[in-house]
C-alpha cells in the first residue's frame, strides 16, 4: 500500500512553520517591549493615577508656569 503523507492545512512544511513561529514570536516581543517603553515614558511625563493629593500638584505647576511667562 502507498504511504499516506500528512500535509498541513496551510500547505507549508514543518520547518517553514517553525521559522515563521520564531519570527512571529520575536516580532511580538519587540512590539510589546516598545509599547511598554512608550507607556513608561508617558507615565513619567504625565501619570494617569493621581497621587495622595489628587491632581493638585499639576494645578500648582500650571500656576507657576503662568506666573513665569
Curated annotation (Swiss-Prot):
Alphabetical list of InterPro entries matching this protein:
Antenna_a/b, Antenna_beta_CS, Antenna_beta_dom_sf, LHB-1/5, Light-harvesting_complex
Any stretches that span the bilayer, and where are they? 23-45
Q: Name one GO biological process term.
A: photosynthesis, light reaction
Q: Per the record, GO CC terms? A: plasma membrane; plasma membrane light-harvesting complex
* Residues in the Periplasmic compartment per record: 46-56
Q: Which residues bind a bacteriochlorophyll?
A: 21, 39
Database matches in Gene3D superfamilies? 1.20.5.250
Q: Which residues form the propeptide?
A: 1-2, 57-69
Location in or out of the cell: Cell inner membrane
User: What highest taxon heads this organism's lineage?
Assistant: Bacteria
Chloroplast is among the record's keywords? no
> What topology does the record note for this protein and the membrane?
Single-pass type II membrane protein
Task: Cite the GO molecular-function annotations of the record.
Answer: bacteriochlorophyll binding; electron transporter, transferring electrons within the cyclic electron transport pathway of photosynthesis activity; metal ion binding
Q: Which residues lie on this side of the membrane: Cytoplasmic?
A: 3-22
Q: Where is it predominantly found?
A: membrane
Q: What does this protein do?
A: Antenna complexes are light-harvesting systems, which transfer the excitation energy to the reaction centers.
Q: Which family does it belong to?
A: Belongs to the antenna complex beta subunit family.
* Designated name of the protein: Light-harvesting protein B-870 beta chain
Q: Which organism is it from?
A: Rhodospirillum rubrum (strain ATCC 11170 / ATH 1.1.1 / DSM 467 / LMG 4362 / NCIMB 8255 / S1)
Amino acid at each position: 500500500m502507498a504511504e499516506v503523507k500528512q500535509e498541513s492545512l496551510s500547505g507549508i512544511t514543518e520547518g517553514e512553520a517553525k521559522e515563521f513561529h520564531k519570527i512571529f514570536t520575536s516580532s511580538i516581543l519587540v512590539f510589546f517591549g516598545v509599547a511598554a517603553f512608550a507607556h513608561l515614558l508617558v507615565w513619567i511625563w504625565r501619570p494617569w493615577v493621581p497621587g495622595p493629593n489628587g491632581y493638585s500638584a499639576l494645578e500648582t505647576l500650571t500656576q507657576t508656569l503662568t506666573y513665569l511667562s
